[in-house]
Amino acid sequence: MIRHFLRDDDLSPEEQAEVLTLAADLKKTPFSRRPLEGPRGVAVIFEKNSTRTRFSFEMGIAQLGGHAIVVDGRSTQLGREETLEDTGAVLSRYVDAIVWRTFAQERLTAMASGASVPIVNALSDEFHPCQVLADLQTLAERKGKLAGLRMTYFGDGANNMAHSLMLGGVTAGVHVTIAAPDGFEPDPRFVDAARRRAAETGATVALTKDAKAGADGADVLVTDTWTSMGQENDGLDRVRPFRPFQVNADLLELADPAAVVLHCLPAHRGHEITDEVIDGPQSAVFDEAENRLHAQKALLVWLLEKR
């Protein structure tokens, strides 16, 4: 059966654990699995600009023995002169998987309904699930476990990282708190979905408008840019509500002494996170970025073996 990875809860807790175990193995032995030997191809489509996503997927596909066919969404007919369902059906005749970084989750869902190969969400407006796999791999390395950790995300609770951290985090048994200012809460649909999944794993989901309360005793502090791609012209009016949610030394002091700091990058230093914290000993930001490579390779291997 074809499996897609469009949102974090597309993997069950057991399946997520399988992918993370494989990611750890592939980090130790990068060329031990070659399911794309041939080479076989993976379509990698970008409607949004990318650095880490592009480099990590291209290199990962190469290490798996395959060839990445990388295209800019603007240079294709995606959703313009044929339906996305038809595009998914056609691309499935050429490649073994489709990786897509897009502006709209519904576009991924539409293409998946017509595709007969796995489709991977490399980022959408609602979710960033590959990033959260890398985050979880990083936490497992640093903490030696996932279940029972207390993770708080600070900033825009309505963005894709907050949604994916909720869904992916509770799938791993992590207690997730979203600390966000008024008006920037997570989508209630995804809060409900995360709480349903949390009921299976013994995790919890909490929302707070108090950054200090969110940091108190936390094992993991996560943040992301306050201004996502496409919001650059919103100016100071957008930034102002987030200032109390900056991850800085004072906030980190409230967390567990062995707390880990994550940021998916790119970071706006001096805004959502300070230099002192991102470059400090509790930061795992650059390990986290590296683990995009290993986690995504593991995901592709897992999906291809499910076909």
From Swiss-Prot:
One GO location term (cellular component): cytoplasm
Annotated catalysed reactions: carbamoyl phosphate + L-ornithine = L-citrulline + phosphate + H(+)
Key words of the record: Amino-acid biosynthesis, Arginine biosynthesis, Cytoplasm, Transferase
Positions in coiled-coil regions: none
Entry binding sites for carbamoyl phosphate: S50, T51, R52, T53, Q77, R101, H128, P129, C130, Q131, C264, L265, R292
InterPro entries, A to Z: Asp/Orn_carbamoyltranf_P-bd (IPR006132), Asp/Orn_carbamoylTrfase (IPR006130), Asp/Orn_carbamoylTrfase_sf (IPR036901), Asp_carbamoyltransf_Asp/Orn-bd (IPR006131), Orn/put_carbamltrans (IPR002292), OTCase_ArgI (IPR024904)
Pathway: Amino-acid biosynthesis; L-arginine biosynthesis; L-arginine from L-ornithine and carbamoyl phosphate: step 1/3
EC number from the UniProt entry: 2.1.3.3
Activity control summary: Inhibited by arginine, norvaline.
Keyword Cytoplasm: yes
Positions of L-ornithine binding: N160, D224, S228, M229
GO biological process, one term: arginine biosynthetic process via ornithine
A Pfam family hit: OTCace
GO molecular function, one term: ornithine carbamoyltransferase activity
Keyword Magnesium in annotation: no
Compartment(s) where it occurs, according to its Swiss-Prot or TrEMBL record: Cytoplasm
Function comment: Reversibly catalyzes the transfer of the carbamoyl group from carbamoyl phosphate (CP) to the N(epsilon) atom of ornithine (ORN) to produce L-citrulline, which is a substrate for argininosuccinate synthetase, the enzyme involved in the final step in arginine biosynthesis.
Family stated for the protein in its record: Belongs to the aspartate/ornithine carbamoyltransferase superfamily. OTCase family.
Record-given protein name: Ornithine carbamoyltransferase
Organism: Mycolicibacterium smegmatis (strain ATCC 700084 / mc(2)155)
